[in-house]
């Protein structure tokens, strides 16, 4: 217990420090073309970005435009800050194409369909704690990185399944996104997008999902490896949808377990988010799957969601973003309340042997 508390103190301290260990710049770096070029070279070194000579000059111009956006935004009186992260020499169009949804070829894959029975197990919850953080409760694994693969849906799904499994078994097990990318192909499309609800159903029907160590992530689609996926580690009993456009209902769900959600993550402020409570410009054009792992309120009274992303630990607040909660629009900020869903696990039981499908027996 003491060790867990110490670990959380260390994590909390690093969250307070925010961008202390990340790439930073100063006004003197903006003084001349030469100093800007030096800044770009330092940024490339920090993020180990390799560019050919011809490409470097083109990317330098993109970098300068992004730098000025970050610089000018940070001078404004906003409750969040931006930074020059690993996306700093990508145009917003390029960023959106790779990380925020242009690979979701069919919008219905994120919009989904209503659950037939409309069940919501937390409907009768009457009170919730003022704040919840499933990281503190040991229900969240280390931040992961989807790379240049549109597999955010798989990462969102896995966060929720890892969370409910820890809640039911008191054991935190890192699960395999790659299994979903390679094998869940009936409705989902690997690196070209997918829907968390369909992934929950895949895991239920298959009888479980294997571990990350057994089937590690490769940031690209491959052939489904039956020898790995049959080694089941964690099972679920299904999933439910949170009532759409209802942040109060979403709060009840998150108070009890991590929840998968879809958002619009394609804006420039989201691209370069660093710290604080994000209130930035965004739409309800859902293009990115993430997971809510808690909520809270700042000292000035701003309510927020704690959202786990899949762009690595250097993005945002060590891989997380706090997004404003309880806004006037029913859809929530960036559409966060439009399509929430979560896995159901009724007991602490998990698979004890390999799964064998009819195809395996032929």
From Swiss-Prot:
InterPro entries: Papain-like_cys_pep_sf, Pept_asp_AS, Pept_cys_AS, Pept_his_AS, Peptidase_C1A, Peptidase_C1A_C, Peptidase_C1A_papain-like, Prot_inhib_I29. Its EC number is 3.4.22.-. Residues 21-131 form a propeptide. It comes from the Eukaryota. Keywords: Disulfide bond, Endoplasmic reticulum, Glycoprotein, Hydrolase, Protease, Signal, Thiol protease, Zymogen. Disulfide bonds join 149-191, 183-224, 282-334. It comes from Phaseolus vulgaris. SUPFAM superfamilies: Cysteine proteinases (SSF54001). This is Vignain. GO terms for biological process: proteolysis. Glycans are attached at residues 326, 346. Residues 1-20 form the signal peptide. The active site is at 152, 288, 309. Belongs to the peptidase C1 family. Thought to be involved in the hydrolysis of stored seed proteins. It is an enzyme of class 3 (hydrolase). It is found in: Endoplasmic reticulum lumen. Monomer. PANTHER family: CYSTEINE PROTEASE FAMILY C1-RELATED (PTHR12411).
């Amino acid at each position: 217990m003491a060790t867990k508390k110490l670990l959380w103190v260390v994590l909390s301290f690093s969250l307070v420090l925010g961008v202390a260990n990340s790439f930073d710049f100063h006004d003197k770096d903006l003084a001349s073309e030469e100093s800007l070029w030096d800044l770009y070279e330092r940024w490339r070194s920090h993020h180990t970005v390799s560019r050919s000579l011809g490409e470097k000059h083109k990317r330098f111009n993109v970098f300068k435009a992004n730098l000025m956006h970050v610089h000018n935004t940070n001078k404004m009186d906003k409750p969040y800050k931006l930074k020059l992260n690993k996306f700093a020499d990508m145009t917003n169009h390029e960023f959106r194409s790779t990380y925020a949804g242009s690979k979701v070829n069919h919008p219905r894959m994120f919009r989904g369909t209503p659950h037939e029975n409309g069940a919501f197990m937390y409907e009768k919850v009457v009170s919730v704690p003022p704040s919840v953080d499933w990281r503190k409760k040991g229900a969240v694994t280390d931040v992961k990185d989807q790379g240049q693969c549109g597999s955010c849906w798989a990462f969102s799904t896995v966060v929720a399944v890892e969370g409910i499994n820890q809640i039911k078994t008191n054991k935190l097990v890192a699960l395999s996104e790659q299994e979903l990318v390679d094998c869940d192909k009936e409705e989902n499309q690997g690196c070209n997008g997918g829907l968390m609800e369909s992934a929950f159903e895949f895991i239920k029907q298959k009888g479980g999902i294997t571990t990350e160590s057994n089937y590690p992530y490769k940031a690209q689609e491959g052939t489904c490896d039956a020898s790995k996926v049959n080694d089941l580690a964690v099972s679920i009993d299904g999933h439910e949808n949170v009532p759409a456009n209802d942040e109060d209902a979403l709060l009840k769900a998150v108070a009890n377990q991590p929840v998968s959600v879809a958002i619009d993550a394609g804006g420039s402020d989201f691209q370069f988010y660093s710290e604080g409570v994000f209130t930035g410009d965004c739409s309800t054009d859902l293009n990115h799957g993430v997971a809510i792992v808690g909520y809270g309120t700042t000292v000035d009274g701003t309510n927020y969601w704690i959202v786990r992303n899949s762009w690595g630990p250097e993005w945002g607040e060590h891989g997380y973003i706090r997004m404003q909660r309880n806004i006037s629009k029913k859809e929530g900020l960036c559409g966060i309340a439009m399509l929430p869903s979560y896995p159901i696990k009724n007991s602490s039981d998990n698979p004890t042997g390999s799964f064998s499908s009819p195809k395996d027996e032929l």
